[in-house]
């Protein structure tokens, strides 16, 4: 029996992204996400808009390629680290990575209720059902270990104040954490439209020019480097 999921707004976008990863896994295979394929088979959901939205799908695959590579490289040089995946949705990166001591997936309670049904997790993978703007750090038991925070597919649905609050929560609990955060250029926020995202009644609301501009908003953080989704596109759809 298939699961019927009722979500709207930003939480619903997680269904579009996992569909994109599942479809790519069955196609050219620049990524292979067995968990995504498994989850899609369990869902009773109309993916027709996501199926037609090639722009959304290409973006999801490109960022998956880039963030998978970055996370894998970081974990290789920080064995035994803790990873916190903020706004995880139905992300399955924790199943594609190794070398971490504990992986925490964090999202809003309604989202985590769906994740718990489809991806019940235990052992070195834990669920945190909280807003990224709350003190979720109190749920992390490990101390004095390297910490990586991944924020994917979230900031473009917020505003500058919300983003600053999320980073304040991080710096309060984990002052030495490394953060990988996906952002969107303001011009793209203003002009770009994704059919499947609009179909879920979510809307892009915020962007920042580059990593230096983001760091200027975050006094406790230092900008290190930035990567473009074009790096993922070069693998996914080489010219």
Segments (PLM) and residue ranges:
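A short, conserved alpha-helix within the catalytic core of class I
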Residues: 127, 135-138, 157-175
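A C-terminal cap/extension of S-adenosyl-L-methionine-dependent methyltransferases
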Residues: 234-239
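Short alpha-helix
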Residues: 201-231
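Hydrophobic/aromatic residues located in beta-strands of well-ordered beta-sheets
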Residues: 83, 103, 179-181, 223
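Conserved beta-strand signature within the Rossmann-like core of class I S-adenosyl-L-methionine
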Residues: 148, 170-186
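Short SAM/SAH-binding signature in class I
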Residues: 144-156
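Short, glycine-/aromatic-enriched active-site segment of Class I SAM-dependent methyltransferases
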Residues: 186-202
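Rossmann-like AdoMet
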Residues: 1-84, 88-130, 142-144
């Amino acid at each position: 029996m298939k699961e019927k999921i009722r979500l709207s707004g930003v939480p619903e976008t997680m269904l579009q992204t996992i569909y994109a990863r599942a479809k790519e896994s069955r196609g050219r295979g620049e990524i292979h996400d067995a968990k995504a394929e498994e989850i899609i088979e369990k869902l009773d959901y109309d993916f027709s808009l996501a199926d037609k939205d090639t722009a959304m799908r290409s973006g999801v695959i490109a960022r998956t390629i880039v963030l998978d590579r970055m996370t894998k490289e970081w974990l290789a040089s920080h064995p035994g680290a803790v990873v916190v995946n903020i706004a995880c949705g139905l992300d399955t990166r924790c199943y594609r990575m190794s070398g971490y001591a504990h992986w925490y997936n964090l999202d809003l309670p309604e989202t985590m209720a769906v994740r718990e049904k489809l991806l019940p997790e235990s052992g070195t993978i834990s669920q945190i059902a909280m807003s990224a703007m709350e003190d979720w750090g109190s749920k992390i038991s490990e101390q004095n270990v390297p910490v990586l925070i991944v924020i994917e597919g979230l900031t473009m649905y917020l505003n500058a104040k919300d983003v600053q609050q999320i980073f304040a929560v991080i710096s309060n609990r984990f002052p030495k954490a490394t953060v990988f955060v996906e952002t969107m250029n303001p011009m793209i926020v203003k002009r770009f439209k994704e059919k499947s995202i609009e179909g879920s009644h979510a809307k892009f609301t915020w962007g920042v020019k580059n990593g230096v501009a983001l760091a200027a908003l975050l006094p406790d953080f230092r900008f290190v480097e930035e990567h473009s989704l074009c790096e993922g596109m070069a693998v996914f759809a080489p010219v």
